[in-house]
């Protein structure tokens, strides 16, 4: 081992970026990568004509449609920290992938559009992060455009999300009138157009004000900001590191990711307060320290065809303890089998490099020949640990699926099983006829499934909508095939567990009344 484990762990910052679609999440990710020297030019996220696709949107359909449908993992160094960013899908149809990703991070950055405020998907994702009790940092984006009043945005954030907020900076104007940021925490003003100040971006504050001979000092917008800040300091919440660490207070930063304004200040301040890797909970209720000597981690994502030319499959592992060393032997907890971790990579979206050592907080990619499932625990030696189960979600949309070309059955089956293991869709088979049914939480999931089956597996599919909207599992010992009727569909999931698909709540209630001793269960 060539690294100091404690120093290495303490330098890690592993976080996810969450937002509603189009709030600017992918753009801010790219600006952070730019500061870390990981890329030379930020791609215009939806610049389909220029071909400058977002670095974190690597799948072909993401480039075509300008949306993130998979979670990307990116690592870079900045100052004395090693940063692991997990860029998650903002589209609500991909909430399953996002929720699982949020189990692999130590903090989260919430990006909000200054014109729109808190949106539906932001609220959903925030609740998942809040439940985990990890720190949440807020970046209110798009100051280069006209948006809502900053005080109004803070009030909405506190009311809708039930969390204290502390503004780290405050906008001096917005849109065409944007002059800069009053940096409360660092006691300086950050100028939007430094050329108006001899090229100097920052003006230090003295007694909360800038020198009176500067043109900005007499600006009415700046004078209004001084009043706003005074009000915030007197009437607002006090800055509390303890509350931030518990996820009870969110530091709020304003800026513009597109024009790269306020992003570097955000990054540097974020790194001061974002936590290093923490202890992870086990299924038995215990915890494993990141400084534990023996290696352990869990699979939170499986991705097929990251390199379509090689038709490969990668299991993404969050390291929780110990030091990963190339070629080490570990135990796969679910099966008890020994596995050699020899061909392991780290990522920049779809680009990767071999890794020889990694520690708690790092995300590594293990080549998967079909051994792994989402939620698997890997451990070294005699640890015999099992980490908490990752969330699964009950689909609300269902389709019957068949191969368009019967000669492509082999490709059809391979594609379906790989995409199911990724967690891209859920698969069921009708109990007697073994017809394939796929389930999703949103319509876009079906579109991506159809696209990937055709483009990655050369297996076009025919999808037939079903009336079913509710899936409920039952205990195998309660199953009687006579329970199947015109009001439901009896099926098995991929673990061979029986379930019923119902068209609506009325059909579900009818079943529950007829079989009162049978417990109907949902996933989450």
Swiss-Prot record:
GTP binds at residues 19-26, 87-91, 141-144. Keywords: Cytoplasm, GTP-binding, Nucleotide-binding, Protein biosynthesis. The keyword Protein biosynthesis applies. Pfam families: EF-G_D2, GTP_EFTU, RF3_C. Its main location: cytoplasm. Residues 10-278 form the tr-type G domain. The keyword Secreted does not apply. One of its GO terms (biological process) is regulation of translational termination. Belongs to the TRAFAC class translation factor GTPase superfamily. Classic translation factor GTPase family. PrfC subfamily. This is Peptide chain release factor 3. It comes from Enterococcus faecalis (strain ATCC 700802 / V583).
């Amino acid at each position: 081992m060539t690294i100091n484990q404690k120093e290495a762990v303490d330098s890690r910052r592993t976080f996810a970026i969450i937002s509603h679609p189009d709030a600017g999440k992918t753009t801010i990710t790219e600006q952070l990568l730019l500061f870390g020297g990981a890329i030379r030019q930020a791609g215009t996220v939806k610049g389909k004509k220029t071909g400058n696709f977002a670095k974190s949107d690597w799948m072909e359909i993401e480039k075509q449609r300008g949306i993130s449908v998979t979670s990307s993992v990116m690592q870079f160094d900045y100052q004395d920290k090693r940063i692991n960013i997990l860029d998650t899908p903002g589209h609500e149809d991909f909430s399953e992938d996002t929720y699982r990703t949020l189990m692999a991070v130590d903090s989260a950055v919430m990006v909000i559009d200054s014109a729109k405020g808190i949106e539906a998907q932001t609220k959903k994702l925030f609740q998942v992060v809040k439940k985990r009790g990890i720190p949440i940092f807020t970046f209110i984006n798009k100051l280069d455009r006209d948006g809502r009043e900053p005080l109004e945005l803070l009030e909405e954030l506190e009311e809708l999300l039930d969390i204290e907020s502390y503004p780290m900076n405050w906008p001096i104007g917005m849109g065409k009138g944007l002059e800069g940021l009053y940096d409360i925490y660092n006691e300086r003003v950050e100028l939007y157009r430094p050329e108006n100040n001899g090229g100097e971006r920052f003006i230090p504050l003295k007694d909360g004000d800038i020198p009176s001979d500067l043109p900005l000092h007499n600006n009415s917008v700046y004078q209004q900001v001084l009043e706003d800040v005074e009000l915030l300091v007197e009437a607002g919440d006090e800055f509390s590191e303890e509350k931030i660490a518990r996820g009870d207070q969110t530091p709020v930063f304003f800026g513009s990711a597109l024009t790269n304004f306020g992003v570097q200040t955000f990054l540097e301040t974020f790194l001061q307060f974002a936590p290093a890797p923490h202890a992870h909970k086990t299924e038995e209720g215990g915890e494993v320290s990141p400084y534990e000597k023996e290696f352990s981690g869990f699979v939170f994502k499986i991705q097929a065809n990251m390199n379509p030319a090689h038709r490969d499959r990668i299991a993404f592992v969050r390291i929780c303890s110990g030091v990963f060393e190339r070629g080490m032997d570990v135990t796969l907890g679910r099966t008890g089998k020994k596995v050699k971790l020899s061909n392991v990579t780290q990522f920049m979206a779809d680009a990767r490099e071999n890794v020889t050592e990694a520690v708690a907080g790092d995300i590594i990619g293990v080549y998967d020949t079909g051994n792994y499932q989402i939620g698997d625990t890997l451990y070294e030696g005699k640890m015999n640990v099992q980490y908490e189960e990752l969330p699964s979600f009950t689909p609300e949309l269902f389709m019957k699926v068949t191969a368009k070309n019967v000669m492509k059955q082999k490709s059809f089956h391979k594609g379906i099983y790989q995409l199911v293991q990724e967690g891209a869709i859920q698969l069921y088979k009708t109990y007697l006829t073994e017809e394939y049914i796929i389930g999703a939480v949103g319509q876009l999931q079906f579109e991506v499934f159809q696209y990937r089956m055709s483009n990655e597996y050369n297996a076009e599919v025919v999808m037939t909508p079903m009336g079913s909207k509710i899936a409920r599992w039952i205990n195998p010992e309660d199953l009687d095939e006579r329970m199947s009727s015109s009001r439901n569909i009896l099926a098995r999931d991929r673990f061979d567990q029986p379930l019923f698909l119902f068209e609506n709540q009325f059909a579900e209630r009818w079943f529950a009344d007829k079989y009162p001793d049978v417990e109907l269960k949902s996933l989450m």
